[in-house]
Amino acid sequence: MQADFVIIGSGSAGSALAYRLSEDGANSVVVLEFGGSDVGPFIQMPAALAWPMSMNRYNWGYLSEPEPNLNNRRITAPRGKVIGGSSSINGMVYVRGHSEDFDRWEELGAKGWAYADVLPYYKRMEHSHGGEEGWRGTDGPLHVQRGPVKNPLFHAFIEAGKQAGFEVTEDYNGSKQEGFGLMEQTTWRGRRWSAASAYLRPALKRPNVELVRCFARKIVIENGRATGVEIERGGRTEVVRANREVIVSASSFNSPKLLMLSGIGPAAHLQEMGIDVKADRPGVGQNLQDHMEFYFQQVSTKPVSLYSWLPWFWQGVAGAQWLFFKRGLGISNQFESCAFLRSAPGVKQPDIQYHFLPVAISYDGKAAAKSHGFQVHVGYNLSKSRGDVTLRSSDPKADPVIRFNYMSHPEDWEKFRHCVRLTREIFGQKAFDLYRGPEIQPGEKVRTDEEIDAFLREHLESAYHPCGTCKMGAKDDPMAVVDPETRVIGVDGLRVADSSIFPHITYGNLNAPSIMTGEKAADHILGKQPLARSNQEPWINPRWAVSDR
């Protein structure tokens, strides 16, 4: 089997690549995907988002190594093992990122990836329903919309932010990210709208695109050039040949793993694993970044939360409403209001993110208390902690070794303590007087730095946004893995295009910038002139130097 382009992975970036590389019919494309079908209610029903992430059928099920700053807990690190990749099992939250994120990328060596460069690609990919005119795309393949916003708690959260003196944004994916507002989701007509829905499924209708279900073992490199991918299917090993290029879009865990299995990575580590070194790139697997979060939970004194729908019977009712009529609670991920805030004066861009949920539940989906409640997922999104991904052995089937090294920087502790205290201030506003009951978590008695730190060590979890392990940068940067055109430095005919190439984590959920990366990488691969830079100026809080709001 052969094709002009062989793409490893059908996730957020891989699906976009398949769609764009095959668009004019001139190139043949093969997409390699180990995971199975994304058709089924657990994936397609937005409200069922917790199910696919917890099912081995759809999830690689990775765990970190014991994290020393989190009581040696092994942190769950899910990645999609299904058509559509993690876009088929994620929370469907749509956040482009802040303009400062991408300007920082360019400062770190990713020339041509500043905000003015990437904004046109966001517009190209979007079909925004109700976004800010002039800042949003309206005819792209990816449907983006707000939820029904019927629960009064969503509005109470936004009003509380206003009362606390914070900004309100009408569209955080438009000109102004900072503030409280309504959250956007990748859903359409009551269904999850994944990268597979938006990109891969339409691409597969073309005669020049083929999806191959298989396990990718390694990239074949001959005389310094990637010529194909060694795969395993049906108990046999074979090679899929690439006439032009191989593109790795396998996630921030599996992309560096594949490079290292293929002999591209830190030479000493590869030799330790018994792998012949094809290209000594010390940055492969390094620079691992992620967002962390905790749940801040409160009892609701009014029976307005989703608590009544948690019993199995009522979940069945909601499921039936969705299955037969595509209406009711099932059509939304239930994250329908949010906030993007700055942690202190002198911080130019938002660095704290809130997802508001009108129910108090634990990570396993069970009620956090035997009562109505509400919660926010709170995270400091610009952590300075860095981790790495390495090989466990030379066996392609072995899970990678994942060390996030969470909370290894003192500033992370300061910022997360602030998150706890700031959330108490927000929930203490008049807008919540009608609903506010006792604090469930962290708990009223958790007040001092030491008490908050103890809570964080036990309750911080990943927000499932790993990135950075195949860093994009200048060719003379020894830790860069790919150049600004996504070419692997030191190997011809090979690119990486997914969240692993982010030089620095973006502020917000990573599905949107991952898809954008696939969109932009496709133009580089095809040798097209990049889309014209935008001259639009995003809103920056004029008080940023002197106030946090």
UniProtKB/Swiss-Prot annotation:
Q: Which reaction does it catalyse?
A: choline + A = betaine aldehyde + AH2; betaine aldehyde + NAD(+) + H2O = glycine betaine + NADH + 2 H(+)
Please list the residues that bind FAD.
4-33
The alphabetized UniProt keywords are: FAD, Flavoprotein, NAD, Oxidoreductase
Active site, per annotation: 465 (proton acceptor)
Free-text function comment from the UniProt entry: Involved in the biosynthesis of the osmoprotectant glycine betaine. Catalyzes the oxidation of choline to betaine aldehyde and betaine aldehyde to glycine betaine at the same rate.
Cofactors demanded by this protein: FAD
Origin organism of this chain?
Answer: Sinorhizobium medicae (strain WSM419)
Q: What is this protein called?
A: Oxygen-dependent choline dehydrogenase
Entry EC no(s) = 1.1.99.1, 1.2.1.8
